[in-house]
């Protein structure tokens, strides 16, 4: 049910620097809201890899099976990528698991609308519905398989991630495509800037998902990155990519406090 997007290119992960420092302030999340949930992929969540956020292999990126594709109303044209939610199945004792356990997930994909079907009969992700298409293991953690679709209550929560924000630099000489992953706190990045050792701070434009681009010539310079999330907080990671950085490498910077 969720859209699949082929990742831009395979990357070689090189951890050049890891900063354990945290940014002052804490993202507090949001109120409980009613929605619905379905599932996609297989029992091992292999069908959820890739996706419209550009994260690629969700296992190697640290997201695992705790993921979901969001409907148009929640996806925000990709700006919601990386945001974290708590969900629980409600008001359906025949299909919800006993005790109404909750799950914690990260938004990694887009659940496209299906206007050939009514929004209450197959077009679950049609706007203005707020809907979560969960990785199968997550759905089975709150409801029975045969339910197919269940009512849920959800809320935004702070993202808890291990290590720093990761910056994977893809592209070529005059096209830098930076994938931003593993963001704690609010999780959803709304602005990315880069500074070479010979440049001022340069704002990147969002290409798709959480891939951000710059056409500046940055090869041969050490790089610093600044990330701003939807709660208004910023994280600056200075000189995390050395002057001999290569395309396809990943560098780890300063994360947000949780």
UniProtKB/Swiss-Prot annotation:
GO terms for cellular component: extracellular region; membrane. SMART domains: DPBB_1 (SM00837). The keyword Cell membrane does not apply. The keyword Membrane applies. Residues 174-253 form the Expansin-like CBD domain. GO terms for biological process: anatomical structure morphogenesis; plant-type cell wall loosening. Pfam families: DPBB_1 (PF03330), Expansin_C (PF01357). Residues 1-21 form the signal peptide. Disulfide bonds join 53-81, 84-159, 89-96. It is a peripheral membrane protein. Its main location: secreted. Residues 50-164 form the Expansin-like EG45 domain. It is found in: Secreted, Cell wall; Membrane. It comes from the Eukaryota. Keywords: Cell wall, Cell wall biogenesis/degradation, Disulfide bond, Membrane, Secreted, Signal. Gene3D superfamilies: Expansin, cellulose-binding-like domain (2.60.40.760), RlpA-like domain (2.40.40.10). PANTHER family: EXPANSIN-A15. Belongs to the expansin family. Expansin A subfamily. Causes loosening and extension of plant cell walls by disrupting non-covalent bonding between cellulose microfibrils and matrix glucans. No enzymatic activity has been found. This is Expansin-A9. The gene is EXPA9.
């Amino acid at each position: 049910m969720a859209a699949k997007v082929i990742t831009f290119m395979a990357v070689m992960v090189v951890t050049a620097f890891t900063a354990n420092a945290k940014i002052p302030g804490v993202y507090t999340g949001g109120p409980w809201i009613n929605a619905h949930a379905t599932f996609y992929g297989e029992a091992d969540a292999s069908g959820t890899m890739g996706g419209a956020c550009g994260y690629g292999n969700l296992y190697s990126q640290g997201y695992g099976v705790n993921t979901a594709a969001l409907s148009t109303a929640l996806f925000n044209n990709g700006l919601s990528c990386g945001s974290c939610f708590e969900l629980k199945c409600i008001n359906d004792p025949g299909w919800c698991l006993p005790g109404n356990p909750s799950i914690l997930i990260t938004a990694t994909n887009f659940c496209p609308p299906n206007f050939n079907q009514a929004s209450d009969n197959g077009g679950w992700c049609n706007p203005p519905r707020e809907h979560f298409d969960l990785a199968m293991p997550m759905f089975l953690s709150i409801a029975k398989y045969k339910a197919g679709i269940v009512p849920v209550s959800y809320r935004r929560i702070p993202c808890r991630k291990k290590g720093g924000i990761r910056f994977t630099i893809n592209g070529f000489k005059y096209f830098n495509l930076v994938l931003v992953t593993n963001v704690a706190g609010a999780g959803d990045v709304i602005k990315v800037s880069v500074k070479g050792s010979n440049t001022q701070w340069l704002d990147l434009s969002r290409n798709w998902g959480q891939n951000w681009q710059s056409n500046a010539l940055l090869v041969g310079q050490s790089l610093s990155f600044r990330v701003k999330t939807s709660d208004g907080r910023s994280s600056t990671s200075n000189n995390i990519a050395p002057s001999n950085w290569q395309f396809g490498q990943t560098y780890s910077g300063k994360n947000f406090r949780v």
